[in-house]
Amino acid sequence: VSGIQLSVNDMVRTGDWIVVQGTLANGVVIDITLITVKVQNFDNTIVTVPTYSLVTSSFQNWRGMEEGGGRRMTVNLNIDMDCVHFCTPDELEHLSSKVQVPAKGDHITNLELYRTYLATYIHRHPGINNNILTMVRYMDPTSTGLPVQIYCFTKNTSWAIYEGVKSQITDHAIASARDFGLKIFNWGE
């Protein structure tokens, strides 16, 4: 009965990437029978899961991500809040070559300009799907600084390509922080 429920409700298909909590299954479904689902994990091990456990418990199916046109990516960088300040006219002039400086007067912070710069950078990145939500936002401050979160979706859902895009964006965000007079929190300091 469980195998029929999986099929009729289109809960899982061969080729779906699934994660089953409480088991070692975290990979691609390679076979579905009435009583078992075989999953090939990313380390090439095979895990067999009873179909009833997929019907009676929750599991994560990544099919929606693969069909949805993007894989969600988040990067959090903790900014040392002691480095945040209002920009001087000289700083604004220098940074205007990197980012469009808003015409709102004297109260523009280096952090605001950095956030705007990153938002423009991810919007222009060829690996990012701009048809899905992209943003750069602040999270609640912590003892390690103010997290600046890059939130976007990669165009390609392949794990290796996703990690490549994420690395490019993370590298760029870390390297460009200094240009804005900002410092990323570092445990070693």
Where does each model-flagged region fall?
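Transmembrane alpha-helix detector for multi-pass membrane proteins
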Residues: 1-5
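Soluble accessory domains appended to multi-pass membrane transport proteins
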Residues: 6-115
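Long, non-transmembrane cytosolic or organellar matrix-exposed soluble domains/tails
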Residues: 97-189
